[in-house]
Design a protein with these regions (language model features):
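Short, solvent-exposed polar/charged micro-motifs at secondary-structure junctions
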Residues: 1-3, 77, 116-122
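Conserved nucleotide-sugar donor-binding catalytic segment
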Residues: 3-90
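Membrane-proximal basic amphipathic "stem/tether" segments
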Residues: 92-95, 99-131
Length: 131
């Protein structure tokens, strides 16, 4: 498998896409004072507690500092805890996070169905490439 390099921050993606988090908890640091304002990781979300924290952080306009693509902060092996969850389990939990954080349910539904359609299209293309 290839490597995934996460970089940059595009906080506007939060409004129209579930895949807005361009960070991994390995390379993510917050001051204690910010945790006191936005809260800690919500362990109610089994595979996406970091996603929930990022969502709350961005919604409250805490963007922090961003490194360049050349600066390696952490190296994460594949096969971690969240990789045991399916695409749809992740998607359902991300949907619950949005609703829990009071995002408009109509917009959340649109983003949800858009993610499903994109996944189906990607799967279709993958099958078509094999033929």
């Amino acid at each position: 498998k290839g490597q995934i390099i996460k970089s940059k921050l595009n906080p506007e993606r939060i409004y129209y896409n579930f895949d807005f988090a361009t960070s991994h908890s390995t390379g993510f640091f917050l001051k204690r004072s910010i945790y006191k304002k936005i809260g800690l990781y919500n362990t109610k979300f089994k595979c996406s507690a970091d996603y929930d924290l990022y969502y709350r952080m961005i919604k409250q306009k805490y963007f922090g500092a961003v490194t360049s693509k050349d600066e390696l902060i952490g190296n994460v092996a594949s096969g971690g805890f969240s990789s045991k969850f399916t695409f749809f389990q992740h998607l359902l939990e991300e949907t619950k996070i949005r609703i829990h954080n009071r995002q408009n349910i109509i917009l959340v539904s649109i983003i949800f169905f858009n993610a499903v359609i994109k996944k189906m299209f990607k799967n279709f293309l993958d099958i078509f490439k094999k033929v």
